[in-house]
């Protein structure tokens, strides 16, 4: 009986400040990847549907990397897995389009 560890059952307490901090880190990652992938799409000269497909592929790759980084203990850092996949997706799209059109214009038009 000496080798039996006692587990404390009950509600799991989550720090709201830590949750907000983790959400801010996710938002920063999404914004950075959106800007970088938008610049890449503009330099590569991607247009119309290919440009949007490139954004969603880059966003999916980031989501996959975030899930791999959080590992099996994702509930230690987030309330649900949904923010890892969809958090900041639309806001990142606006950043992507901004960098995409700017660099496309600078490289291929002027």
UniProtKB/Swiss-Prot annotation:
Which stretches are transmembrane?
Answer: 29-44, 51-71, 90-106
**What keyword terms does UniProt attach to this protein?**
Endoplasmic reticulum, Membrane, Transmembrane, Transmembrane helix
Checking InterPro entries in the record gives: Emc6, EMC6-like
Q: How does it sit in the membrane?
A: Multi-pass membrane protein
- Principal location class: endoplasmic reticulum
A Gene Ontology term for the protein's cellular component: membrane
Describe the family membership recorded for this protein in Swiss-Prot or TrEMBL.
Answer: Belongs to the EMC6 family.
Q: What is this protein called?
A: ER membrane protein complex subunit 6
The organism of origin for this protein:
Xenopus laevis
Q: What gene does the UniProt entry assign to this protein?
A: emc6
